Amino acid sequence: MSKTIHYQKTHFITSAPDIRHLPEDEGIEVAFAGRSNAGKSSALNRLTNQKSLAKTSKTPGRTQLINLFKVEENCHIVDLPGYGFAQVPLEMKKKWQKSLGEYLQKRQCLQGLVVLMDIRHPLKDIDQQLVFWAVDQNIPVQILLTKADKLKSGARKAQVLKVREAAVDFGGEVEVDAFSSLKGIGVDKLRAKLDEWFAPAFELDDEFIEDLDVE
């Protein structure tokens, strides 16, 4: 039984400084991560058709907390702290990096990771580290090459192919697609990917209902 997920009903639950302050490790979580200027907040707002679900900031690096959003029962989106921006003090960068690594390596309910990279500057060192962390934990990764509207169609396709070729080195399940919050490029594909990752939550519901019917 396929379930229609209403992403527009997504709402904020809580913020946490680290994994220990998050709610119980249960259900299914899909995490969004990216450099501080990769357009992560804009992508979340476009995905959910909401203008201010994730707060955008003109000062990259302001999002220092792990933000949790409820999509459906037992389905959550996690907005991880932006990373790697020059204006952020080194100690804070180290703290965020530790927080990211800990979340990816220890959070059992994490079923997929969306990594956002500016299509003009993809695969920076810390982007690659993030993907390797996920692959090491057998977590599937969707790379979104954001701000795709900044390139003409031919250049956009060439860049996607280039990053797809590079992504082979990661091993694991890593997909690469172009994305634009402004023009809506790749939004339907992203929703389809999240539908796939969230699907087991509804299979559990169906099994529970069947058990009740049997009783």
UniProtKB/Swiss-Prot annotation:
This is Probable GTP-binding protein EngB. GO terms for biological process: division septum assembly. GO terms for cellular component: cytosol. CDD domains: YihA_EngB (cd01876). GO terms for molecular function: GTP binding; metal ion binding. The keyword Signal does not apply. HAMAP family: GTPase_EngB. Keywords: Cell cycle, Cell division, GTP-binding, Magnesium, Metal-binding, Nucleotide-binding, Septation. Necessary for normal cell division and for the maintenance of normal septation. Its cofactor is Mg(2+). Residues 26-200 form the EngB-type G domain. SUPFAM superfamilies: P-loop containing nucleoside triphosphate hydrolases.
